A protein has these predicted regions:
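C-terminal domain-closing interface element
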Residues: 65-85, 113, 343, 348-355, ...
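Secondary-structure capping and boundary motifs in well-ordered enzyme cores
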Residues: 259, 284, 288, 310, ...
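Hydrophobic alpha-helical bundle architecture
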Residues: 306, 317, 323-396, 408-417
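Extended hydrophobic packing segments that form well-structured cores
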Residues: 417-456
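Alpha-helical support elements that line or immediately flank enzyme active sites
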Residues: 17-34, 293-305, 350-358
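C-terminal regulatory domains involved in ligand/effector binding and gene-expression control
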Residues: 73-252
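Conserved phosphate/anionic-ligand binding catalytic regions in large, soluble enzymes, centered on
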Residues: 8-26, 276-295, 338-346
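Accessory "access/gating" subregions that flank catalytic or transport cores
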Residues: 201-333, 337, 445-456
Length: 456
């Protein structure tokens, strides 16, 4: 069983699968090399499939090298690390794990391949060689979405994640509802009891507060930072100007729909920070990192100030929904399109908000189902391989959809026709049926309608 904090992780933008995952892979590989690190004279990085096709726009190349240098997504000081990396590329010397220098030629030692490796669309192989050109070690990694990374052996053996026994196990939404009903528990209460198999409640409290703090700080940076996002599209950050407009109009307008502008603002701020490579919370991916903070801030600002108890309830319920998608379908845009990113995040947010609004366990799952039902078929076709267009606006749309799905579920008096389990199954099958052009390759859709300059 996964922890909700496997779904909610602190990292850096712009992508959990294409930035955080490769950084983790690079870090793991260099740790694997430590016993013979002094023998390493050369490292070769081979990127495949979506990691190659959108790798430059998603900073996959940079992230992999930063991982090899000893950095991890949760703790990296991205400004300092990027400066160190720039110096390394200029001098042609890469310092492995911060302690062993090797020669590195970006154009010879980091290779992009359009074909896929056999087990997943996001594959990469890292190889180490000695001074004689003999291979010392190699490993193939798959970045399977949401910052989850597995070796080929782990994927083949089904051991990519630790198998932790919890008090109330479930593998489907129906089983989750049955367990809660059988033991007379709310979904939030049941999931938090399961979390005790991973850590004490004091640690859960601290992690929940940290998640909200990072989300809020990210949003504040987004409010304050003006300018053009890098990458060549000349996309202007919109959050600062929208905030000024909303604050200026607060006293003179009486627009009942203005709350939607605030929700858009919250999502824009986080998504623009993510696009700029800032620190975000993967929820469940970086490409969808603006949805859940926007819904939480909507509740905090317009309904009721969040306390730790409410925050834990939201994260528990929404995290459980994310776990269902992760284990029974996919949260990888390269595997199932954006329905697996913004679609899943919207579904998670709808469930969490419904819990905060006092919805029943059944209404929570109904809200999650509604949000996904109306995300089915959503493509992942980022222009220029950048997490900018359509990604930033799509996060805002996902947040608004989540709130509407929650309201629909709370007001409904009849039973729904489609269960959450069925819509998860449908999402996965739809993604597998989707042409690869629309699964994070930038080979179709909007990515071809508007051709962007190649990212350097």
């Amino acid at each position: 069983m996964l922890s909700i904090f496997d779904i909610y992780k602190i990292g850096v933008g712009p992508s959990s699968s294409h930035t955080n995952g490769p950084m983790i892979a690079g870090y793991r590989f260099v740790q694997q090399l430590l016993p013979q690190l002094n023998k390493v004279a050369r490292i070769q990085v081979d990127l495949y499939g979506s990691l190659s096709l959108t790798g430059k726009g998603h900073h996959t190349d940079r992230a992999t090298l930063l991982g090899l240098m000893g950095n991890q997504p949760a703790t990296i000081k991205i400004g300092d690390a990027n400066q160190t990396l720039r110096e390394a590329l200029q001098t042609g010397k890469l310092r492995l794990n911060g302690q062993h220098d090797i020669a590195f030629d970006y154009h010879q030692d980091l290779l992009f391949h359009q074909d896929n490796l056999p087990l997943h669309e996001n594959g990469m192989t890292l190889s180490a060689f000695d001074t004689q050109g003999q291979q010392i070690d190699f490993e193939t990694y798959y970045s399977v979405g949401g910052g989850f990374v597995a070796t080929a052996e782990q994927l083949q053996n089904g051991t990519a994640t630790a198998d932790v026994t919890v008090t109330y196990p479930f593998t489907s939404a129906d089983e989750m509802l049955h367990q809660a009903e059988k033991h007379g528990l709310s979904l939030g209460g049941m999931i938090l009891r399961n979390e005790l198999a991973f850590q004490e409640m004091a640690v859960i409290d601290a992690k929940a507060d940290q998640i909200w703090r990072v989300m809020s700080q990210c949003m504040e940076r987004g409010f304050a930072t003006e300018g053009i996002l890098e990458g060549g599209l000349n996309v202007t950050r919109r959050a600062p100007s929208l905030l000024k407009k909303l604050e200026a109009n607060a006293a003179i307008e009486n627009d009942p729909m203005e709350v939607m502008d605030w929700i858009n603002l919250f999502a824009f701020a986080v998504s623009e920070e993510n696009a700029a490579g800032g620190q975000v919370v993967t929820s469940p991916t970086n490409g969808a990192a603006g949805v859940i903070p926007a819904v939480l801030m909507y509740y905090h600002r317009f309904i009721k100030a969040l306390d730790t108890k409410q925050l834990k309830d939201f994260l528990a319920v929404s995290g459980a929904i994310g776990i269902l998608y992760k284990t029974n379908a996919s949260i990888s845009g390269a595997e199932v399109g954006c329905q697996g990113e913004v679609g899943v995040s919207s579904s998670m947010a709808a469930a969490g908000l419904t819990a905060l609004r006092g919805g029943s366990n059944e209404q929570i799952c109904m809200a999650a189902e509604i949000a996904m039902e109306h995300s089915l078929g959503m493509t992942c076709d980022p222009i220029g391989g950048l997490v900018q267009v359509p990604c930033i606006e799509r996060n805002a749309m996902g947040a608004v959809k989540a709130i509407n799905a929650s309201r629909m579920a709370l007001k409904r008096t009849s039973k729904c026709l489609i269960s959450l389990d069925k819509v998860i199954e449908t999402m996965y099958q739809t993604g597998k049926d989707m042409n690869k052009k629309y699964r994070e390759t930038s080979l179709g859709g909007l990515a071809l309608i508007h051709l962007a300059p190649l990212c350097e």
